[in-house]
Amino acid sequence: PITIERVTPDLPVSPTLGTAYLRINGTYTTNPFRPIDRSGWSVEAFSTEEPEAQTGYDDNGKAFSAIDDAPCTYWGTQWRNAKPGPPHWITIDMGKSEELHGFTIRGRADPFTSDTPKASGNPRIFNVDVSDDNASWTRVGTFTVENRIENEVYLDHKATARYFRITVTATQADMYQTCIADIKAF
């Protein structure tokens, strides 16, 4: 039996029905879902990218760097000349419909150590939307994450879609630029 001793003011309890509403958040100690093969993925669209290559790093700043499986490259929204602030978004075409349970977002590493996240620019708050046709979109999650090299986020309910869009609405240290080194789905 469950005994409810008290509830917070925003959690309604119906005395006539004897019903209580409980919200329980759980976590996984290890990810139980299989990674989705990214060999057929492509970047369908993006809000902005840095069009000029950084010396010695031809792909840094380009949107396709977010799915190139190379943690040393990254999608960086424009930082030379124009410096548009969030929201920044990237749309990925997985090539076919997939069952989605969550995502791993790898932020840009500090330039001097690959295990430490850059202090600013990595996603802090972002939305995930999915679509079957790249026209009608459904929001499947809004996430707030810490500044880690990798953040794993889980959807409340699985979703099936061909396309997904990640929209970063706030970055670490509230920087104008967004940096994502790698996006994986599971």
Segment roles from a protein language model:
Residues P1-P12, P84-H88, E98, A109-F186:
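Trp- and acidic/polar-enriched beta-sheet ligand-binding modules for extracellular glycan
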Residues I4-R6, D10-K96, R108-G121, T142, ...:
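Disordered, acidic Ser/Thr/Pro-rich linker "stalks" and the adjacent N-terminal cap
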Residues I105:
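Phosphate-coordinating loops and pocket residues in cytosolic domains that bind phosphorylated ligands
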